[in-house]
């Protein structure tokens, strides 16, 4: 009992540490220049305290701890405030806090000249808190609060520089695409309420219903919107219009992994539903390949990293599709470290080059930004799944499991090609941004000696090297791993990754001296993001607008305002006058007869005189 009390008190301390800076916003401290420092310190302390219950939980061998507070009863349904602390939430909380701590410290350097930096830090903290609510929720209502919370905070943070049209458009785009996903979530909530009369996860899992395709498809739609899967993915690269710390937090430990986390939470329902698994697998495979293709030809450093996130999210969805939720969760945790670090390194480069994001205008940075360069290379290698870095422990396992599971060969092939492309676009970033000769303005002064820049990247660098081993050692698998495997399957992931590296280097070296006279169709497809934004954002609105214009002009103007009223009145008037009178309305003839009469009268008067 004492262990549980200590456990509960340490968790409460962690969460209260996070809410303290929010409470301080109502005092004069919020106007103080040291407020960002307070927020950063609060998160660092919360991380250190959160390690205590996590360590206790892992080594005590518990399955989960659920705390329940009755809130209200609506007719027959009981609504509770219920927190579920299992392996997933207990490991994710310290990871999210650690990554956010580093991002907050980096923000103090990156956003130092922003007049509203205190508000920025408050928004970032609220973003983290809503994610914590989502992760620890034990019922759909709390999950929905966290879900909508990360949605609205992402809108406020992506549109932070609201004086720019692009930032406003990107923020609105993020909200609108997520609205489509939210429809699926609300549909699933309504279905569970009507059919099972509960929103509690445990009660949903134990109540056997014959056909769960409708709510599961709703949840998959919700995950597609939030985790930027194919079809609802265009908002993710657009979200790069926000400040770099926002991109780092959005892509590492909050918003985008929420969709994958939702599917992990509801995995017990999907476990024996083959239709749902196949749909999830195919969606993930298409996403991971399509976004990897798009990343190959982008020139904006942040957009390349954004597409790599979408590709990794596709890989996580593939993992859920092959019935391995613990592996998907492991990839969420390992991905958070190196993805946050990649964004912080790109932020360091962008800030030092006076907000230049085009990799064609960089080059030679290994001489002037040695620490950033080292971190970027380690992060890129971790992303590609280089052995014994963080990414290897999850990515290699996922591909091995996919190779040996009863999956369809098509989805597996797409995933392997996408893995190869990951190495290709990572090589491209390193080649263009870091190597060769400088291609930027020589007047730029570059300095990476601020501890606010070095320390967070250093922490994430250590995480990108060691975290994978530590986390994989402490996550218990939910299914029996493959005992035996042929050598060629074991080395498949490494082989395709090395192939990607070699091809990318070969292409980069070739394109230095030779350039395509006319870009190929494949290049256009990749560079224009598969024509997706053009079709969705240009062609479809144009069709809708032209149809509405025709309806307005034909239906309203021509038919109602012209034909139905004035013309019909004149037509009926003419018909009735022709029917009633003998006169045919030949006005020229009438005038002629009138003139003839007048002339005859004049002639008679003249002759009389």
Swiss-Prot record:
Its EC number is 7.1.1.2. It is found in: Mitochondrion inner membrane. The chain crosses the membrane at residues 3-23, 41-61, 90-110, 115-135, 140-160, 174-194, 214-236, 244-264, 276-296, 304-323, 328-350, 368-388, 410-432, 460-480, 491-511, 585-605. It is an enzyme of class 7 (translocase). This is NADH-ubiquinone oxidoreductase chain 5. The keyword Transport applies. Belongs to the complex I subunit 5 family. GO terms for biological process: electron transport coupled proton transport; mitochondrial electron transport, NADH to ubiquinone; mitochondrial respiratory chain complex I assembly. NCBIfam families: NDH_I_L. It comes from the Eukaryota. GO terms for cellular component: mitochondrial inner membrane. Keywords: Electron transport, Membrane, Mitochondrion, Mitochondrion inner membrane, NAD, Respiratory chain, Translocase, Transmembrane, Transmembrane helix, Transport, Ubiquinone. Pfam families: NADH5_C, Proton_antipo_M, Proton_antipo_N. Core subunit of respiratory chain NADH dehydrogenase (Complex I) which is composed of 45 different subunits. It is a multi-pass membrane protein. It catalyses: a ubiquinone + NADH + 5 H(+)(in) = a ubiquinol + NAD(+) + 4 H(+)(out). Core subunit of the mitochondrial membrane respiratory chain NADH dehydrogenase (Complex I) which catalyzes electron transfer from NADH through the respiratory chain, using ubiquinone as an electron acceptor. Essential for the catalytic activity and assembly of complex I. One of its GO terms (molecular function) is NADH dehydrogenase (ubiquinone) activity.
């Amino acid at each position: 009992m004492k262990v549980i009390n200590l456990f509960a008190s340490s968790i409460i301390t962690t969460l209260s540490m996070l809410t303290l800076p929010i409470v301080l916003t109502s005092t004069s401290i919020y106007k103080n220049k040291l407020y960002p420092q307070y927020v950063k310190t609060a998160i660092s302390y919360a991380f250190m305290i959160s390690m205590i219950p996590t360590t206790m939980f892992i080594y005590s061998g518990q399955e989960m701890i659920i705390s329940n507070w009755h809130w209200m009863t609506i007719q027959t349904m009981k609504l509770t405030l219920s927190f579920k602390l299992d392996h997933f939430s207990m490991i994710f909380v310290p990871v999210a806090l650690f990554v956010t701590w580093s991002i907050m410290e980096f923000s103090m350097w990156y956003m130092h000249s922003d007049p509203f930096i205190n508000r920025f830090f408050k928004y970032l903290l609220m973003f983290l808190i809503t994610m914590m609510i989502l992760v620890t929720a034990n019922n759909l209502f709390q999950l929905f609060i966290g879900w909508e919370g990360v949605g609205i905070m992402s809108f406020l943070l992506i549109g932070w520089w609201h004086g720019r049209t692009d930032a406003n458009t990107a923020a609105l785009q993020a909200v609108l695409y997520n609205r489509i996903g939210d429809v699926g979530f609300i549909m699933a909530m309504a279905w569970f309420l009507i059919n099972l009369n509960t929103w509690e996860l445990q009660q949903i899992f134990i109540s056997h219903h014959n056909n769960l395709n409708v709510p599961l498809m709703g949840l998959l739609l919700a995950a597609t919107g939030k985790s930027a899967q194919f079809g609802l993915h265009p908002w993710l690269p657009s979200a790069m219009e926000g400040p770099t710390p926002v991109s780092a937090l959005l892509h590492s430990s909050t918003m985008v992994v929420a969709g994958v986390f939702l599917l992990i939470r509801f995995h017990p329902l999907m476990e024996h539903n083959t239709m749902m698994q196949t749909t999830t697998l195919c969606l993930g495979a298409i996403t991971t390949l399509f976004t990897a293709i798009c990343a190959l030809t982008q020139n904006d450093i942040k957009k390349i990293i954004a597409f790599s996130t979408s590709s990794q999210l596709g890989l996580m969805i593939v993992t859920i599709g092959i019935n391995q939720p613990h592996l998907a969760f492991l990839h969420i945790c390992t991905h958070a470290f190196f993805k946050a670090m990649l964004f912080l390194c790109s932020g360091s480069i962008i800030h030092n080059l006076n907000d230049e994001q085009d990799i064609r205008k960089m080059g030679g940075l290994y001489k002037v930004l040695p620490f950033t360069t080292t971190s970027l290379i380690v992060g890129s290698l971790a992303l590609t799944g280089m052995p014994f870095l963080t990414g290897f422990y999850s990515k290699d396992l996922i591909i091995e499991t996919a190779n040996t599971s009863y999956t369809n060969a098509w989805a597996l092939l797409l995933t392997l090609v996408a893995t190869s492309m990951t190495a290709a676009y990572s090589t491209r970033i390193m080649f263009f941004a870091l190597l060769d000769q400088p291609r930027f303005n020589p007047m730029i002064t570059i300095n990476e000696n601020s501890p606010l820049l070095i320390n967070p990247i250093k922490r994430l660098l250590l995480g990108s090297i060691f975290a994978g081993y530590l986390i994989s050692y402490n996550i218990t698998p939910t299914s029996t791993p493959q005992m035996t495997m042929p050598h060629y399957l074991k080395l498949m992931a490494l082989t395709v990754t090395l192939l990607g590296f070699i091809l990318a280097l070969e292409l980069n070296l070739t394109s230095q001296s030779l350039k395509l006279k006319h870009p190929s169709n494949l290049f256009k497809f990749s560079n224009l993001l598969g024509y997706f934004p053009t079709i969705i954002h240009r062609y479809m609105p144009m069709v809708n607008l032209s149809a509405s214009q025709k309806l307005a002009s034909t239906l309203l103007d021509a038919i109602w305002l012209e034909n139905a009223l004035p013309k019909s009145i004149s037509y009926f008037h003419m018909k009735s006058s022709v029917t009633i009178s003998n006169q045919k309305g030949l006005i020229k003839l009438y005038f002629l007869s009138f003139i003839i009469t007048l002339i005859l009268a004049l002639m008679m008067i003249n002759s009389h005189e």
